[in-house]
From Swiss-Prot:
Pfam family, one: Claudin_2
Chief location category: membrane
Record-stated family: Belongs to the TMEM178 family.
Tagged with keyword Membrane: yes
Domain of life assignment: Eukaryota
InterPro entries linked: PMP22/EMP/MP20/Claudin (IPR004031), T178A/B (IPR039625)
Protein name: Transmembrane protein 178B
Gene (name only): tmem178b
Record-annotated membrane-spanning stretches: 172-192, 206-226, 252-272
Signal peptide residues on this chain, from the entry's feature table: 1-23
GO cellular component, one term: membrane
Location in or out of the cell: Membrane
UniProt keyword terms in alphabetical order: Membrane, Signal, Transmembrane, Transmembrane helix
Length: 294
């Protein structure tokens, strides 16, 4: 009896912690973060080079005066690959620096400039020229599609926009359903604990497992959406330069923690009724003898 109660109380406590972690993850804006400080430094050094007529800038690593022939061959191959890549994707150093990349953090509802990463952005925000955060759209809008592109590229971008929009909707929708199901399961579990109903406790555990499943779907679609955005065509519009570091923030790990706690809570609550002994009635059962009921 004590083991069953302990499992039930532990499951309800873990489910409440899972609700808190998922709520924090939903309300925060640190699911995905980018750091463009190295990119800014490279572009500043690129813009500060000499631009005199007839002056050709050649970096030191392009002058292998003491290199062997094999190293020269490997270096020429690397230069050829880099040149082909820039011709294919139009991502030369000048092209990369002509586009402005900022250090941002993104959540389910908004995308914000990171605090203290760029003094120019901080001054613009302080003056009211730009807002720190912009809302993420969950409806289709053609305003974000560049106008000076060919028809085939524009069609590809439009299809990718729809696909990215569906992934964002699935991420937010399944995360909201996961929180609602876990909350409903916690209410059912509390009622089953107060009324000592094993069936309600078992149903609460199943709801916790279902909420964890929905949370898995939401997180997987979130990761798929981020990877899809990074691999969109054309790369010179949607890709990131190599010196911009990016990765998942603490909100994503908070959501994964809530997922794990909800699954553990579901396991505990479904196991609790089977551990508790079946209550025996003190009243003897009536039996039928010789056509009469005793």
């Amino acid at each position: 009896m004590a083991a069953g109660k302990l499992l039930l109380y532990a499951g309800l406590s873990l489910s409440l912690c899972a609700l808190g972690m998922l709520a924090v993850a939903i309300c925060s804006d640190h699911w995905y973060e980018t750091d463009a400080r190295r990119y800014r430094e490279r572009c500043r050094s690129f813009s500060s080079r000499r631009k005199d007529p007839g002056f050709i800038y050649i970096p030191n690593n392009s002058l292998p005066l003491r290199a062997s022939r094999s190293r020269l061959d490997r270096w020429e191959e690397k230069l050829l690959l880099a040149r082909n890549r820039r011709q294919l994707f139009a991502m030369s150093a000048a092209d990369e620096c002509s586009k402005r990349y900022n250090s941002t953090n993104m959540g389910l509802w908004s995308k914000c400039h990171r605090l203290g990463f760029d003094q120019e952005i901080e001054d613009l925000i302080r003056n009211g020229s730009i807002a720190r955060c912009s809302y993420i759209k969950y409806h289709y809008s053609s305003a974000t599609i560049p106008k000076d592109l060919s028809y085939n590229i524009t069609k590809t971008i439009r299809q990718d926009e729809w696909h990215s929009l569906h992934l964002r909707r699935m991420t937010a929708g399944f995360m909201g359903m996961a929180v609602a199901i876990i909350l409903f399961g916690w209410i059912i579990g509390m009622l089953g604990c107060c009324w000592d109903r094993g069936l309600m406790q078992y149903v609460a555990g199943l709801l916790f497992l279902m909420g964890g499943t929905f949370c898995i779907i939401s997180l997987c679609t979130c990761v798929a959406g981020i990877n899809f955005e990074l691999s969109r065509y054309p790369r010179y519009i949607y890709g990131l330069p190599d010196d911009i570091s990016h990765g998942y923030g603490w909100s994503m790990f908070c959501a994964w923690g809530g997922l794990g706690l909800s699954l553990i809570a579901g396991f505990f609550c479904t196991l609790a009724p089977s551990v508790q002994p079946i209550p025996r009635s003190t009243c003897p059962k009536s039996r039928q003898e010789n056509g009469t009921v005793c």
